């Protein structure tokens, strides 16, 4: 996961990707990411990448986008960022801290994808790296 789990308890996804009912208004809408119930968790880069955007807007507060090869991951509802625009980051490097929740969006080659697909791919790559490190191979290709 891109965040530390300080209590070693499972982190709950509070809102999934796709067609949803707004948690406050009850109105149907398309949710372009996933939300996690986290409170000021440290966020880490999931691979070597570059900060491609940082900003703030009224709806999502502070946000940061990291480009990992053909993947672009945007984290919203942040309380602070530690990696600056155009800065290179390495896997495991602390890049930001979440606010009361974390909203995550993912694009592959410019096309929006379900962030759970990205996280599932990451988990598979981590398992492969663990296996490969036993064989002396230490590369992760995000392209």
Describe the residue ranges of each PLM region.
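Surface-exposed, glycine-biased beta-strand/turn segments
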Residues: 1-62, 90-91, 128, 133-143
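Zn2+-dependent peptidoglycan hydrolase active-site motif and core
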Residues: 29, 45-82, 100-106
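Conserved, short, structured surface segments that act as functional micro-motifs
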Residues: 13, 62-67, 85-142
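Gly/Ser-rich catalytic serine loop of serine hydrolases
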Residues: 40, 79-86
């Amino acid at each position: 996961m891109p965040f530390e789990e300080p209590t070693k308890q499972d982190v709950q996804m509070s809102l999934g990707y796709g067609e949803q009912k707004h948690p406050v208004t009850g109105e149907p809408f398309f949710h372009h990411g996933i939300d996690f119930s986290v409170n000021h968790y440290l966020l880490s880069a999931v691979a070597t990448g570059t900060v491609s955007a940082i900003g703030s807007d009224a709806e999502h507060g502070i946000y940061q986008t990291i480009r990992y090869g053909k993947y672009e991951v945007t984290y919203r509802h942040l309380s602070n960022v530690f990696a600056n625009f155009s800065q290179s980051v390495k896997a495991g490097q602390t890049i930001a801290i979440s606010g009361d929740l974390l909203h995550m969006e993912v694009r592959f080659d410019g096309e929006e994808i379900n962030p759970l697909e990205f996280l599932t791919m990451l988990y598979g790559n981590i398992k492969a790296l663990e296996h490969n490190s036993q064989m002396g191979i230490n590369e992760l290709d995000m392209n």
